[in-house]
């Protein structure tokens, strides 16, 4: 317990939720809200990748077009009537340049990295403020823990300072899926920002009652197995030539060129 437990009002949502997802992917954060039983409206979705938005629409029964975050402006989000609605804006930007599995090029403003697309969110929120518009009451971000590593902390601190300048109170913490009832060792940084001075606590750990074997099937259809002949051919080509078959390479290149988000 801290002094803020006494001086700040606990956050509570009493109005209908309008969800705005930037870097939406296939809508995993909307899926979580549904699993929680939350009632909400898919208000706006910003996703550049055509495959991801097709998946989003198929999963959620929506019909959103692709949108480029670099071309989105304040008016495109259509945030209005905040007295009647709670706007929840998610912005889980690409972790590509932060993850230990990537090149760790960082997220500095103007760096041109995919993780640097975070600052497009700054631009949009600044446009809202400067036009005397209505800011979303809740912001949510999920990313790899390296988002606040020693190397990235200066940029992360700039981001926190910017949000505080708009009137947000920020809470962030690294949480691991294995501590919340899921048989997976997956650590991520979660951050909530509330417009105003509100108190918030991240949930307490949940005992793990399932193991990986509980999710596995005893009998699996043959179609889910890799064909040995094709696998051997692929491995041989990789060893001999160091290349993938061209049709697979073209498809992957197309996807990588189109994406602004990673489907975490």
Predicted regions and their residues:
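S-adenosyl-L-methionine
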Residues: 1-48, 52
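Accessory recognition modules or surfaces
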Residues: 2-17, 62, 183-185, 189-194
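Conserved acidic residues
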Residues: 49, 65-73, 174-178
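Conserved SAM-binding loop
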Residues: 56
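Active-site beta-strand/loop signature of hydrolases that rely on acidic residues for catalysis
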Residues: 25, 47, 68, 137-143
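N-terminal Rossmann-like NAD(P) cofactor-binding module of classical short-chain dehydrogenase/reductase
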Residues: 88-90
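Short, structured coil segments at secondary-structure junctions
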Residues: 39, 59-60
């Amino acid at each position: 317990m801290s002094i803020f437990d006494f001086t700040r009002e606990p956050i509570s949502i009493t109005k209908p939720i309008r969800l705005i997802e930037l870097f939406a992917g296939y809508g995993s954060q909307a899926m979580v809200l549904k699993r929680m039983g939350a009632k909400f409206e898919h208000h706006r979705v910003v996703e550049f990748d055509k495959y991801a938005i097709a998946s989003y629409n198929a999963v959620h029964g929506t019909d959103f077009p692709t949108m480029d975050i670099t071309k989105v402006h304040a008016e495109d989000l259509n945030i209005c009537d905040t007295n009647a609605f709670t706007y929840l804006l998610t912005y889980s930007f690409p972790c590509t340049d932060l993850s230990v599995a990537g090149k760790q090029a960082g997220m500095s403003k103007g760096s041109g990295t995919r993780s640097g697309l975070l600052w497009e969110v700054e631009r949009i929120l600044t446009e809202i403020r400067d036009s005397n518009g209505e800011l979303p009451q809740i912001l949510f971000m999920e990313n790899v823990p390296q988002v606040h590593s020693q190397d990235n902390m200066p940029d992360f601190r700039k981001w926190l300072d910017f949000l505080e300048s708009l009137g947000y109170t920020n809470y962030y913490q690294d949480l691991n899926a294995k501590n919340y009832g899921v048989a997976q060792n997956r650590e991520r940084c979660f951050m909530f920002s509330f417009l105003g001075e509100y108190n918030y606590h991240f949930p307490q750990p949940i005992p793990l009652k399932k193991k990986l074997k509980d999710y596995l099937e005893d009998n699996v259809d043959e179609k889910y197995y890799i064909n040995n002949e094709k696998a051997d051919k692929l491995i041989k080509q990789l060893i001999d030539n160091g290349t993938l078959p061209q049709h697979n390479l073209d498809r992957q290149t197309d996807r990588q060129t189109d994406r602004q988000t990673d489907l975490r």
